Each structure stands twice: as C-alpha cells, then as structure tokens.
C-alpha cells in the first residue's frame, strides 16, 4: 500500500532518508551501453556536481550516494533547524543560487525577495524539504540527458522512492 509522501516525510521535521530514482525507457544514466557502444560515464560527474551544489544550498547533509547505470541512490539527512537559523538575506541568497535569473540583477532581486516575508517563509520551508531537494537534483540532469539524447519527455521513473 502506498502512502502520501507528506505522511512518510512530514514537512519541517528532521530525518534521514534513503532515496532512489530510476531512469525510464531503458535510458542510461551513466556507464556504457553495450548495444550502441556509447559511453554515458560523463553523466556521473553531472550527478556528483549537482549533489555537491545542492548540499551547500539546502538544509541537508548528504551522507552518501551511488550513481548506477540506470538509477541513483542518495542518503540525505534533512536538518530544518539549520534553515530556521538562516537570516532572511541568507534564505534569499540560497534560493537565488538555486534559481538565478538572467534578466534581473541578482542584488536587486535578492533585496526584493528579502522584503517579502511570506515568500521567505515559503522558501525557507522548501530549502529544508526532501521533495524539493530531489526535484532540484533530478530536473537539471533530466534536461541535460534529454538534450544529449535528442529526445523529450520523462527521464526519471515516477517520483523518487
């Protein structure tokens, strides 16, 4: 029986989780495809770099990860107390590292964001949310892989488990 993610991982509560994301359509995350002879090993670095980047931005500790040929494992500890201790400016700066906009000066955008308390509250919650962490890990990798493979659509099978 499946349970809602909000029941398994209550928002705003600390915990350590083992998350798994699998590729769809027999796509390769990394390794070498024996049928085509094509190597996807460079994608391992994409995943490693993104995990490192997100670990600096989110209120999480990454205890381990494994990048396999068609899936990845991540062991993450969510630390909401860390996000609660961040200043308004720090929350804004972290969010803008995650979602930079090219059409607006970063300092202007950070100032506007820091002045919006309700938005800061929402972003603080997102920066210590397991689902947001996994979303921010998976989405850029799937976009790059789809672009490289010349296809569209899902790269990951359902949501992470």
Regions found by a protein language model. Name each.
Residues 1-161:
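Short catalytic/metal-binding and nucleic-acid-binding patches
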């Amino acid at each position: 029986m499946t349970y809602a993610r909000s029941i398994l991982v209550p928002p705003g509560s600390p915990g350590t989780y083992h998350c798994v994301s699998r590729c769809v359509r027999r796509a390769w995350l990394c390794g070498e495809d024996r049928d085509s002879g094509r190597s996807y090993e460079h994608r391992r670095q994409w995943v490693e770099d993104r995990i490192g980047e997100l670990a600096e931005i989110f209120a999480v500790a990454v205890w381990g990860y494994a990048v396999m040929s068609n899936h990845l494992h991540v062991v993450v500890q969510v630390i909401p107390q860390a996000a609660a201790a961040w200043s308004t400016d720090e929350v804004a700066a972290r969010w803008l590292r995650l979602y930079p906009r090219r059409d607006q000066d970063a300092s202007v955008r950070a100032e506007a964001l820091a002045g919006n308390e309700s938005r800061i509250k929402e972003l603080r919650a997102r920066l210590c949310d397991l689902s947001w962490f996994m979303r921010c890990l998976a989405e850029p990798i799937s976009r790059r892989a789809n672009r490289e493979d010349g296809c569209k659509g899902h790269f990951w099978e359902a949501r992470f488990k």
